[in-house]
């Protein structure tokens, strides 16, 4: 099968992945299947955290889940930028005081909700 290639921009890469995934796994939302696969990939990351390909499997599945819920590559990239800006604007506890085995979550108050 002839799959599309992608250029250097992230939107084109998401679109190429989307086309391949549609041809390979079909057009349905596949939510339960994607979540099941994500859980398995997270186990693989935990077993081998220094393998970047395992981390990328998680990224690809998350992107697959997003476009299968109806979001375009442009919307996905815009959401990524918006979330990054939102996280940068939040207050965070000092990482040195955090348990390294627990998530570091932003400080929650009415202004950050």
Where is each model-derived feature located?
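Flexible "arm" and connector segments at domain edges
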Residues: 1-113
